Amino acid sequence: MKDSRRYLTKSRFKEGLECRTKLFYCNNPEYNDSNNEDSFLEALAEGGFQVGEIAKFLVSDDPYKDDISIDTLDYDLALLKTNKKLEKDKVSIAEAAFKYNNFFIRVDLLEKHGKTLKIYEVKAKSWGESDETNPYEYFIKTYKVGEKKGQRYINKEWFYYLYDITFQRYIIKKLFPDYKIESNLILADKTKLTSIDGLNQFFKIQRDPYSSYKKEIIFPKNIKKSDLGTIPLKKINVDQTCDFIEKQMINNYSFEEYINHLSYLYKNNIREFQDIDQRCFSCQYKTDSNSKLKSGFSECFKQNGKIINEQSSLVDQVWKSTKKEVDKGHFFIDQINEDDYLKKDFDNEDGMSTNYRQYLQIVKSKENDKSSYYHPYLRDIISEFEKPYHFIDFETSSVALPFHKNRHPYESLAFQYSYHILDGDKIEHKGEYLNTSPEFPNYSFLRSLKNEFSSGVKGTIFRYHNHENTILNQIYTQLINESSIDVPDRNELLDFIKHISSPTKNNLGEWKDGPKSMVDLYKLVVSLYYSPFSKGSNSIKYILPSVLNDSEMLRNKYSKPIYGTDLISSKNFKDWIWLNEDKHDPYKSLPPIFTEIDKNNPIDISTFNNLDDGGAAMTAYAYLQFSETKPELRKKIEKAMLRYCELDTMAMVIIFEHFLERINKF
């Protein structure tokens, strides 16, 4: 049973640092919390669990034989075991437990050498060469201009990590006033290469059979540090940074006053409201109309005199405008002065300017105008593209612990693509690729994609946003560092990348835009089309239902079982209906990606269902790499991955079909 004592822990401290009001909502069963599983899924997708486990080998050559881990969830037993280990003059401990007043923390790693205690916070976050020179100068920046010129501030990217380790150091110092305390981060070192294949395979994830919410790592018996080769992690001392943070004021409190205030609020279950600012719009304590739970987000707005309901149009729906409007005291779209967005040009060479798109959204929202807008350039721009039209989508992963030898942390792995072609009235699911085996997939991925165009690239290739172009550039860099002996078709693969992509910043000068460089359909949407139905989002998950809402022709077409037939071929569907009476969004027509999977398997991956924009595929890929998976379960996951990726490229086809439909009406 979960302990009900209300200690201010590391995670609760982070919530209080984000917003004091959150301390009332967190762990409160009456309130919805969309982050309940997010931290686990993020750690799974990035390999965070494996980083935490392999980091133990930085403080012990044999952490399992040495029994350094405090595994119990029981507060009192964890404290007892920690204190017992600390009786030794020299010892390493993982998940060491400490309690001071109403604070309770578990230190990821701790080393005791006589009267010196070294504490380590382990994060699956990268550290690279540019960060190397002086960590303090990297973590603590200086304002160069403006009213604050010369003042120091904490690098926003590292803010919560650094406050976390400072919080831990404060408690350890209080408990051990006569000891020297050294505080450190352990991070994924992008300057190091792995020296073995399958480093991640040493540490598999399974569910704790005695706990519904705890996951545990399983590992080979007798594994030692020497078995792991080069460990791509780095220790970073942050004592100077912690000193700086402890001297900073937080909401007119000193550091010590603030953490004690948070502890008081949480212990006594007191809700202390704060003023609404732009951060509130990303609050996890929201609900949708179907939820029976309370919305902390709505209650905070109500406390500030603002009532939110399903019809409320909030400023965060206006593209790239949230902070600017909230700083003016505007929280609803009808409070915005649309004339503020008319001060710059309506158009640019691609179509709508950002200002005009924002203006359109504000005006349409105020007037309850549900009609979509099509820019006059639509006909000219769409008509210029050479036929046939190709649509590709990549699914990729980048993890802290590389799966393969001679790879850096967080190198991209391209494990899946889908490819549709639209040629006249004919739509075909032309190709796909999926590799979930524990091998480096990038070159076989690229070969397969190249073979899709074996007769040459005729027509126009479309992607949705920058991802596909970025990945091809990263594979280009990987290939440049290979020899033709190891990759015999290296030069052909490089030429193919240059043919269909544009160089990114790191490859500027390597080539000019390829003769068949992919066209970004996302940019066309942003510049040429606006639908109130998308609620300000340009994600393909919102644009697809928007164009279907706008097109009776497409609704009629895809309400029939024509997908996966002779009319429209498919590799993963048969006689499929994309739209039906209950669900007018193709993404909702598919069952949740892991619905069919037995929940008695190592991880309850039914929780993946809320992931989108590639998150589900990336997490599924990580699951297949990081867990013991039965063949029949693997096949089910792979089938679901293939269907979802196919839908992404079919979504692009439908969006483009709508553009073609519109230009024929002009």
Language model segments and positions:
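DEDD superfamily 3′-5′ metal-dependent exonuclease/proofreading module
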Residues: M1-F666
